[in-house]
Amino acid sequence: MRRPPNNATISVMDKTELVGQLVRQFETSARAALSARDAVVQEARDGATPDEKREDARAAHQAQSMGRAQQKRAQDAMAAVDTLATFRPGKLPPTAKIGIGALVEIEDADNGEGRTFFLAPVGAGMTLHGPGGDGDFVVVTPTSPIGKAVLGKVNGDIVDVTVEGDVREWQITYVG
């Protein structure tokens, strides 16, 4: 049976650090989106003469759309931060059913390829760094195909997941 990187056991404090990394990534994303929004607004306001602005309504409309999209991106990132503010994943015994907050390792039944992921309410696809050099973890949400497949399962269960049109069989080899 495979274990998480470096045979580590993820503790409550470690998961708190993983959540902290997620928060920092979302905060960085929000700041970048707000900066991009401000740059678009500045360019729309100062980048053309009044005559050019009147003649090119299409460019003004595009700038407005980009500004709104960046504002939405920032709002979405801050909503994720709000969600994580109350997210307190605890340590799970190896026999626990998988739920949000679990650290899960799965292994491909055909080739033995393993993946370790952190099941979180937000942050799909983000990469987190394990505390103390315990390796990297990808964030999976419960709405993703793999998230849906593993919810409620236990160590040793086998799940089928469709990846790029192919059904793959994965065995759960660690829950923590």
Question: Which residues are covered by each model-predicted region?
Answer:
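Short, charged beta-turn/beta-strand-edge "cap" motif at the junction between a beta-strand
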Residues: 110-111, 162-170, 176
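Helix-rich terminal scaffold detector
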Residues: 2-80
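C-terminal structured interaction module
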Residues: 153, 157, 170-175
